[in-house]
């Protein structure tokens, strides 16, 4: 994570589970060299369990972006409406959590989804040829191509049902055997 003051640190994104409820924490936590800051002023709705994540820094806008690929989430959009499922299902959602230059968080969802209920416990590996700032942060300022393979999603859990755990049907989950290439494609303006 690169913070607006150019400090490198970590960010714990929203995640499961709360001590007194079988539900995810909705807020991220900033980890700095000398302290940590729970960001209870913001709710991250679209990704709640360890999933594949790619990180980007845009020096032009001074924004940090994290893209989450699938996984498990209490919330998803159903017919354009943010909807809660307390069973915290597997989702196909690809979402972006951004920190603006003034330190505020924003969350958005991509129109493209994962091809299946996958991504939970998966890992994103940067392509070694992609420019980075270190710490696995892709340097958007150094990318000039209209499209570029930026890395791979490896492993994780695949499910054929959104809520297999709520009905004790874990037989429909398995280790993900597909390796996904991830491409960054410049949007037309």
Where are these regions (language model features)?
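Acidic, serine/threonine- and glycine-rich low-complexity intrinsically disordered segments
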Residues: 1-61
């Amino acid at each position: 994570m690169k913070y607006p003051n150019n400090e490198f640190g970590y960010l714990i994104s929203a995640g499961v589970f709360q001590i007194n409820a079988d539900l995810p924490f909705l807020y991220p936590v900033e980890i700095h060299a000398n302290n940590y800051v729970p960001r209870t002023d913001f709710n991250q709705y679209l990704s709640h369990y360890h999933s594949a994540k790619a990180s980007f820094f845009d020096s032009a806008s001074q924004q940090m972006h994290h893209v989450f690929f699938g996984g498990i989430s209490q919330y998803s959009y159903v017919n354009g409406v943010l909807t809660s499922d307390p069973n915290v299902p597997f989702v196909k959602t690809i979402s972006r959590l951004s920190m603006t230059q003034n330190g505020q968080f924003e969350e958005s969802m991509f129109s493209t989804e994962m091809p299946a209920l996958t991504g939970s416990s998966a890992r994103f590996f940067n392509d070694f040829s992609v420019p980075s700032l270190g710490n696995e942060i892709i340097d958007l300022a150094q990318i000039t191509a209209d499209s570029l393979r930026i890395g791979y999603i490896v492993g994780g859990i695949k499910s054929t049902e959104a809520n297999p755990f709520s009905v004790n049907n874990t037989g429909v989950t398995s280790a993900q055997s597909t390796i996904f290439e991830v491409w960054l494609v410049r949007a037309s303006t």
